[in-house]
Amino acid sequence: MHLARNPALKSIYIKIRKRKTMSIGTALALSAPFAVGLAALGSGLGLGRAVSSAMEAIGRQPEASGKILTTMIIGAALIEALTIYALIVFFVVLEKMA
């Protein structure tokens, strides 16, 4: 492992090796950023698919572009809200660890 490059990971690894088990704080420190990354990845993929479908629908029916764009923007806001909620949970967990 290349832990020498990242002192934060090295200190976490040393703590785990000394205890032989992982504490809840360590598990949260390792899993919270991963969860936010997954939320952002899912949000990005979903948003890209929604915009792609909306642009395709506008290409087929240009006269309905107003309704399509309105619906797409509402859907995009809901998709982004889920990522923002994940980020808020991350900061709450980070606060609990400190």
From Swiss-Prot:
One of its GO terms (molecular function) is lipid binding. It comes from the Bacteria. F-type ATPases have 2 components, F(1) - the catalytic core - and F(0) - the membrane proton channel. F(1) has five subunits: alpha(3), beta(3), gamma(1), delta(1), epsilon(1). F(0) has three main subunits: a(1), b(2) and c(10-14). The alpha and beta chains form an alternating ring which encloses part of the gamma chain. F(1) is attached to F(0) by a central stalk formed by the gamma and epsilon chains, while a peripheral stalk is formed by the delta and b chains. Belongs to the ATPase C chain family. F(1)F(0) ATP synthase produces ATP from ADP in the presence of a proton or sodium gradient. F-type ATPases consist of two structural domains, F(1) containing the extramembraneous catalytic core and F(0) containing the membrane proton channel, linked together by a central stalk and a peripheral stalk. During catalysis, ATP synthesis in the catalytic domain of F(1) is coupled via a rotary mechanism of the central stalk subunits to proton translocation. It is found in: Cell inner membrane. The record marks 80 as: Reversibly protonated during proton transport. The keyword Transmembrane helix applies. One of its GO terms (cellular component) is proton-transporting two-sector ATPase complex, proton-transporting domain. This is ATP synthase subunit c. The lineage of its organism: Bacteria, Pseudomonadati, Chlamydiota, Chlamydiia, Parachlamydiales. SUPFAM superfamilies: F1F0 ATP synthase subunit C. Keywords: ATP synthesis, Cell inner membrane, Cell membrane, CF(0), Hydrogen ion transport, Ion transport, Lipid-binding, Membrane, Transmembrane, Transmembrane helix, Transport. The keyword Hydrolase does not apply. It holds the Pfam family ATP-synt_C. It comes from Protochlamydia amoebophila (strain UWE25). The chain crosses the membrane at residues 27-47, 73-93. It is a multi-pass membrane protein. NCBIfam families: ATP_synt_c.
